[in-house]
Structure formats: structure tokens, C-alpha cells
């Protein structure tokens, strides 16, 4: 018999494998036929890195002595900088303020005093405007890194404001996706030492010797982000991360199978190792290895039993998906 098995992977796209099952006496031979999707080649494009740190009043307290934020930004941007052809540094609030020095000087100048001198409206932050500004300056060969506590300046009509803000930011990203359908977005949640005023709308409170969350947004072509993640893993950010989520458009999954013909065991099953490159989906390894994320169009015949990392160097694939085929 000749069947086609469609194995949708919910975090990516689909893999289609044709299965031919032939009876050979008491045993059966199963032959798999597939069209390999090649793994992406190493990127040779010229990539422009743009780094934006929000210089608002709510960010001042992160710039205290012993700030984890400054160390993380310095280390992470230094690593990304090696993978790009240029790096531009900015402050951002109501306007974009270019920084003319190098990365070392930029980090040293992450202080409340420098924030105030840089200009713009440091009192109120409109994230809708910030994302609109960043995305409109984000060409197809640009990767933007935005560092912020992402606190909204909420007016009295909070419910109406939050709904409007959510829709506005969604529309901004949808417009960017229309221009660049391969746009990917990563949001990394971290914590830093915090000493100063915490703002919420018109209220504020002085906090001392506490840790507060902040976020790094990485925005750019998902192929670029996938290569960044391979060479500069998000999980290795100094101090560890507190959370991670990402968006990438559906795509073909690069995959191959080591052999095509199998003889079934006594239970009538075969075990197939599927070599796949899942990096382009930008998801965390916890999601990659969660078999609940994988769906078979014919679960009576094909089951995903496990997903394992490929740790060997020089391999273009990221994971091995183990499939059980029933004859």
C-alpha cells in the first residue's frame, strides 16, 4: 500500500513522507520516500545591529551600582556585535537619540544623569510610539535590540487605554510583517538590581535593594535570529533568564532521514530518526522537546515518541525526532 503521512509540527510547519509497506512472508518491509528540505546555509549577508535602551524615569533605578542590567547588555550586545557588520547605539523615548561613542562608553553612560542629558521626554513613555519608530527603521537586514522595563504610562481610563495600546502595537507589528514576512520577534525576561523610584501611572514608590524585571526584545529576520541563537544562546545570558517567548512565521522545516528501508519488529513497528533543524521557529528548547507540540495526521500509524538535542559540532540539524511507525 502507498500512503502519505502528514506530520504537522505545531511550532513550525509540516513534513510529508510517503510510506510504502510491502509484505515479505512473516515480516514486512517499510520504505519511506521523502523530499529532503535542506538546512539553511550559514548567513553571509551584511547585518546591521541597532541597540536601543529606553532612557525614561522608570529606567533610572536600574542604573544603580551593581546593576545586572548593564552587565547583561554589555555582554549580550558584545557577542551579537561579532556576528554583524555594523552596530549603532541609541537612547529612545519620545525620540531616537543616537550615541556617537563605542559600546564601552555607551555602557558607562547608562546613568540617570546621562539619560537626562541625552534629551527627549524622559517623563512619559509611549510604547506604541517606540515600537512604531523601531520597526519603521528596521530594514530587512537589520536586527534591533530594545531594552526596557516595558512599563506603560497608564491614564485614569486604564481599561480603554490598555485595549487601545494592545491593538496599536499589534497593528504596528502586522504592518512590519507585511513589509518583511520573515520578521521574527524574541522577548527575553530578566531581572536586575533596582534602587530608586518605581512608577505606576501617577503613583511612585521608592524601592531599595530589590530586584525588578526588565525585557530585551530582539527583532529581525528570523533566519538571522536563529543563527544568533545558535552562536549566542539566549539561555547562556549571564545571570540566567526568567522567561522567554518568540514569534516566527510558519516555514518549511529542514529535515532528512538517515535511511529509507526498514524491517518491522515483532510488534509490527519501526523506529525512524528524523533529523530536523527547528532553530528557525525561535522557540525554546523546552517547547522543542515537548512531544505534545507535535501532531500526526494519522496517529494510529505514526507517533512522535521523543525529541533529542544534537550536540555535535558542525551538524546543520538541531534535533532528532524519533517516530514510531506501525505497519
Where are these regions (language model features)?
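Eukaryote-biased recognition of electropositive, low-complexity segments
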Residues: 180-302
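Von Willebrand factor
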Residues: 41-148, 152-153, 184-187, 191
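Extracytoplasmic/secreted cell-surface and envelope-processing proteins
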Residues: 59-63, 97-102, 152-162, 195-200, ...
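Acidic, polar low-complexity linker/tail segments
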Residues: 3-50, 55-63
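Well-ordered, non-membrane alpha-helical segments in soluble/globular domains
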Residues: 65-76, 113-132, 157-177
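Extended, charged low-complexity segments
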Residues: 283-327
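A charged, solvent-exposed segment within the mature domains of Sec-exported extracytoplasmic proteins
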Residues: 134-207
Amino acid at each position: 500500500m502507498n500512503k502519505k503521512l502528514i506530520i504537522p509540527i505545531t511550532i513550525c510547519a509540516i513534513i510529508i513522507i510517503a510510506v510504502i509497506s510491502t509484505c515479505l512472508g512473516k515480516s514486512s518491509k517499510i520504505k519511506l520516500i521523502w523530499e529532503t528540505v535542506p538546512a539553511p546555509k550559514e548567513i553571509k549577508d551584511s547585518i546591521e545591529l541597532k541597540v536601543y535602551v529606553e532612557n525614561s524615569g522608570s529606567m533610572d533605578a536600574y542604573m544603580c551600582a551593581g546593576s545586572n542590567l548593564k552587565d547583561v547588555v554589555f555582554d549580550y550586545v558584545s557577542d551579537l556585535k561579532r556576528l554583524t557588520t555594523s552596530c549603532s547605539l541609541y537612547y529612545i523615548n519620545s525620540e531616537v537619540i543616537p550615541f556617537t561613542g563605542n559600546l564601552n562608553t555607551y555602557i558607562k553612560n547608562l546613568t540617570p544623569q546621562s539619560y537626562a542629558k541625552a534629551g527627549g521626554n524622559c517623563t512619559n513613555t509611549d510604547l506604541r510610539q517606540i515600537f512604531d519608530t523601531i520597526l519603521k527603521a528596521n530594514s530587512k537586514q537589520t536586527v534591533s535590540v530594545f531594552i526596557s522595563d516595558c512599563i506603560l504610562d497608564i491614564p485614569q481610563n486604564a481599561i480603554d487605554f490598555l485595549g487601545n495600546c494592545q491593538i496599536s502595537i499589534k497593528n504596528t507589528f502586522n504592518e512590519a510583517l507585511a513589509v518583511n514576512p520573515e520578521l521574527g520577534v524574541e522577548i527575553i525576561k530578566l531581572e536586575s538590581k533596582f534602587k530608586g523610584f518605581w512608577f505606576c501611572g501617577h503613583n511612585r514608590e521608592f524601592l531599595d535593594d530589590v530586584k525588578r524585571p526588565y525585557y530585551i526584545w530582539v527583532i529581525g529576520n528570523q533566519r538571522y535570529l536563529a543563527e544568533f541563537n545558535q552562536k549566542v544562546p539566549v539561555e547562556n545570558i549571564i545571570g540566567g533568564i526568567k522567561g522567554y517567548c518568540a514569534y516566527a512565521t510558519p516555514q518549511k522545516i529542514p529535515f532528512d532521514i538517515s535511511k529509507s528501508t526498514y524491517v518491522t519488529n515483532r510488534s509490527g513497528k519501526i523506529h525512524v530518526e528524523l533529523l530536523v533543524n527547528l532553530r528557525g521557529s525561535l522557540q525554546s528548547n523546552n517547547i522543542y522537546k515537548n512531544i505534545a507540540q507535535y501532531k500526526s495526521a494519522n496517529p494510529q500509524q505514526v507517533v512522535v515518541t521523543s525529541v533529542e538535542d544534537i550536540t555535535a559540532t558542525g551538524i546543520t540539524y538541531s534535533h532528532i525526532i524519533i517516530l514510531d511507525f506501525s505497519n
